[in-house]
């Protein structure tokens, strides 16, 4: 509902205050083709691409081939109304073009009720970097720096950090200004995120704008000292932003990991089962955002994300160490999760080096990820606590095969 203009209008028509951007801004940025047009007009750099004419269905195949030839391979077919990786297909060879176009359009129609697809150049070895913006109704707009969200599976984010480990100050400033210009182009109000792809050569290109608070907004709150939920409520109340761009600065480094009920060793397929034990870590610089508790059940009816684990530290190295320890200390039994995979990312030399392009998972686990044999001690301890046994008794029963 957060990105549906009809809902925004319905809230206002009911005499309530809508917390978020206008229906116009939601519509303009919710459609990727109209967003591209608006960004081009505003002077914001976009990824080279081609729209496909909707008024010439008989010539669609020929036009698709011509558009793909102009853009060049490899390319992306993207749903105009898409999001979350749905309605998106990579095409590396012309012979796969028509098949992937049909699949992308079909998935887009099923997911969004709109099968419109356009062609976009695929920027390989790129990074997904996004900028948080905040705008009021008095013409004031600021950015709260960037987040890097390059580590993804199925075009969905797994690990996010702020700030990006590779941006220099000039690029950070230019990207922030571009994000503010993008928001101003649609008279944006409230909190929003402008997403960019950062190419190997350092150029960045507009990807899309999310007209809502995103999953990863806590890491921006950590490094900026700003409560984004409070600020968007203040904006909705008609108040001015309490700070200017010059008042904002980056404070330390923050990392967020998304804890999913899924099996990373089996293509990241969603998993189901009970949350028999759910014991998150705690301590200085650790935050958990979740909507589940011990005893709940992960089911196929909902998104597999169980929680967001966030850490904040004075610098990136300290943040990585804190996150690795937090992932190791997180006790979550009863359903398969990606916690082991997240631990391995935090311990990977490529991640420590900041070598985090969007193909990070495919490059570093080309044959897929496999679960390491775990020390049974923490599981025994958790089981003992759950069932009221002494750790020694639980260990004996587990070793003899009579318990778990």
Identify the residue ranges that each predicted region occupies.
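Catalytic cores of soluble metabolic enzymes centered on carboxylation/carboxyl-transfer
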Residues: 179, 218-404
